Design a protein with these regions (language model features):
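FMN-binding flavodoxin-like domain, especially the glycine-rich phosphate-binding loop
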Residues: 1-44, 48-130
């Protein structure tokens, strides 16, 4: 079954993660004739809301790499406030051309633990904050 809705979900300090995730998600939505939605969890207020993506939908979830890991600031939100409900996920990490170390595995595990089925992953070189 093809997803009926594609969600672009990101934390983006420089705008590069947003640009990358939205481009991937929009192209998927266009190709699959699915509804497209965005969710930006960059600002703290957005991380106070539970985000639930139900079965039959797909989330392209992106975050930057800090020291080769999912940023500590984001771990509680991704672990406690993002729910998969059987949805598909495409984890995407952006890194500053050094190394993304374990972040891709870490983000995939966080999403899987919260009820997502990761069907692909992406590690993209992009502008970094430091």
């Amino acid at each position: 079954m093809l997803p009926v809705r594609i969600h672009a979900v990101w934390f983006s300090a420089t705008g590069t993660t947003k640009k990358t995730v939205t481009r991937i998600a929009r192209r998927l939505a266009d190709a699959l004739d699915a509804v497209y939605e965005e969710y930006d969890y960059t600002l703290p207020a957005a991380r106070r809301q539970v985000l639930t993506i139900p079965a039959g939908e797909l989330a392209v979830v992106g975050c930057p790499t800090y020291a080769g890991r999912v940023p500590n600031l984001l771990m509680p939100y991704l672990r406690d406030m993002v729910r998969g409900g059987g949805a598909l996920a495409l984890p995407v990490v952006l890194f500053g051309n050094r190394n993304y170390d374990d972040e891709l595995m870490e983000l995939s595990k966080l999403l899987t633990d919260e009820g997502f089925y990761c069907l692909a992953v992406g590690a993209i070189v992009g502008e970094h904050t430091y």
